[in-house]
């Protein structure tokens, strides 16, 4: 009898943590709420809450695009703001939990932290990768949270804000941004079309701690170079849309002789500016 009681006690002890884990993983943002179906940029039909109050960005790009119209809806951040970014982050979001990002050279998604933040929807914004539909399906299956992809290259940015406005019921905030983007892009296209080839400057867009991680021709991060009528000095054999860009050597920089070198602060620019 004592052995049976002990066995039953041990079984209960083993079941308790499993039940707790199942409850945590079983968070269902669609339970007991009105829902609707949207079609995302990957062609996936996704059931989402009709009234969304908590959003998780998939990474730094999604976080940046969401911030102007939905900072107060963020359930967490893909990454904490840097010292340089801090002044541009509303105080309400600076101390939100971080759960990492899906893609890029800094991919570090913490699935448990993401679920703990209890978002009602996960939104991925950026370039349309070949695997995007499968990626979104996988994340949605693993988390149990509706996951949508919105294409947000430079050409699609206005449409991306309109789709965000629809999903988050914030069309009134999204539409002015969409119109501003359309106006700015059109102005840049018209001005660059007037530039003769002889006046188009070659540009090296360097990032990272050394400035040698370049946003090369064909990458979504470098679209703005083409938009303004410049020529990307770095033309790689294989285009990288990862956050780290395409790494080049100093010898390659010397070889292409760019007219202009663009560097971000916090890296070699600070050293050169001294």
Task: Show the residue positions of the predicted features.
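Extracytoplasmic substrate-binding proteins
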Residues: 45, 121, 134-213, 234-235, ...
């Amino acid at each position: 009898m004592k052995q049976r009681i002990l066995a039953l006690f041990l079984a209960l002890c083993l079941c308790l943590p499993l039940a707790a884990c199942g409850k945590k993983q079983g968070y269902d943002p669609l339970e007991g709420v009105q829902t609707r179906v949207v079609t995302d940029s990957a062609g996936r039909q996704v059931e989402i809450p009709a009234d969304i109050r908590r959003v998780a960005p998939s990474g730094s790009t999604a976080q940046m695009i969401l911030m102007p119209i939905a900072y107060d809806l963020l359930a967490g951040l893909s990454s904490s703001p840097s010292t340089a970014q801090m002044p541009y982050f509303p105080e309400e979001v600076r101390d939100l939990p971080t759960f990492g990002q899906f893609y890029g050279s800094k991919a570090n998604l913490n699935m448990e932290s993401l679920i703990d933040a209890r978002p009602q929807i996960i939104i991925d914004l950026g370039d349309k990768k070949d695997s995007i539909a499968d990626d979104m399906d996988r994340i949605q299956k693993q988390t149990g949270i509706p996951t949508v992809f919105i294409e947000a290259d430079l050409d699609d940015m206005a449409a991306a804000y309109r789709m965000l406005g629809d999903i988050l019921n914030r069309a009134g905030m999204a539409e002015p941004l969409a119109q501003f983007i359309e106006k700015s892009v059109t102005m840049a296209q018209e001005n660059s079309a007037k530039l003769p080839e002889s006046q188009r400057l070659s540009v090296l867009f360097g990032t990272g701690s050394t400035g040698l991680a370049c946003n090369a021709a064909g990458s979504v991060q470098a679209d703005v170079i083409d938009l303004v009528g410049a020529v990307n000095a770095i033309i790689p054999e294989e285009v990288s849309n990862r956050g780290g860009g395409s790494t080049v050597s100093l010898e390659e920089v010397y070889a292409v002789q760019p007219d202009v070198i663009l560097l971000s602060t916090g890296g070699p620019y600070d050293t050169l500016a001294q």
